[in-house]
Amino acid sequence: MKKRILALSLSAAMALSLAACGGGDGGTQPSGSQETTSGGASTTEVANKDKPLVWFNRQPSNSSTGELDMAALTFNDNTYYVGFDANQGAELQGTMIVDYIKAHAAEIDRNGDGVIGYVLAVGDIGHNDSIARTRGVRAALGTGVDKDGSIDSTPVGTNADGSSAIVQDGSIEVDGTSYTIRELASQEMKNSAGATWDAATAGNAIATWASSFGDQIDIVVSNNDGMGMSMFNAWSKENKVPTFGYDANSDAVAAIAEGYGGTISQHADVQAYLTLRVLRNALDGVDVDMGIGTEDDAGNVLTDDVFYYDEATRSYYALNVAVTAENYEQFLDSTVTYEPVSKQLDATAHPTKNVWLNIYNSADNFLGSTYQPLLQKYDDLLNLNVEYIAGDGQTESNITNRLGNPSAYDAFAINMVKTDNAASYTGILNQ
């Protein structure tokens, strides 16, 4: 098996970002809790608690401490998590911004005061991905402050004079000129209904910040492209202020040609494949690595430069790629499947199975515009009849209320609203 094993301590800091609302393709009628042979004949009953389960995008964990929920990750012998390497991606985003500053420092400093000021849109203060990205940016820019052994990821509110105890001023030297780097403002983008990662809230925030700071804002940074594009369209584009996001959504990648500074691809094409592939393998009764690190009967296989597997936490992680003006044209369509794993499985050897899959928030831009379209392409290739359930981004009950008949499905793919809430789902499967 081609896989790199990481320590549990590293995995605890990781999480993920994916699909959204929609409907599955046609296929067989729900097969209930029966296990079928390759010829389609039913054999033995499978209890819901023993059916394959994959968590994706939100890794079961304590949202305050980041400690992984191992009970959820090991719910049964066919339970896995699929996401991306949050720390590697966070570091990559920070490095991308620093590289941009080094190449454009003089023009970035809009008012010529020697201070490169940035504002930061924080997605969700309790989400591991959001925490990692905030820390990655602050670490790279030198604005991070240590708190209990890690960089403080708390939003600063406003920090016009650099006196905040949450962040500090950083510095960078470019062509013999020294610049101060200051986080002028940051806030969690949560709307009045409680939904986080909210693009509309980010659009309102940049208007407020622009009114307060004016040409002190030299860079806009966001934990994701949904919020980043909202700020870019509302203010940054017109004022020619580089904006950096995360997710490589198609609209953000296209906007690089219009001044969007850059984004990070979390290899959603690999993540979406892994999300359904681990279920396919469990349903086929083959090794979980089949079609992943080991070539399958159709020729599908991934190389270890695009993913790794952490056996201790039963977690698959896709690796990230920086998308900038130099390479953005390669990423313009984020819904194209990954070519090495785009071969159709034989329907006789891999008969159709029924999967219940939810997306935590139907309004999430990344999950809706990138991840779900990829899932819908892979479900055809893997002979899976997937029912897609779209949540409201606020409560688990909006989703779990639609899992009233788990016996109608052969496997489950779950994207929680909050990482703490795995038991809301496993409790249903245990009934």
Which sequence ranges carry the predicted segments?
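Positively charged n-region of N-terminal signal peptides that target proteins for export
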Residues: 1-10
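C-terminal motif of bacterial Sec signal peptides marking the signal peptidase cleavage site
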Residues: 17-20
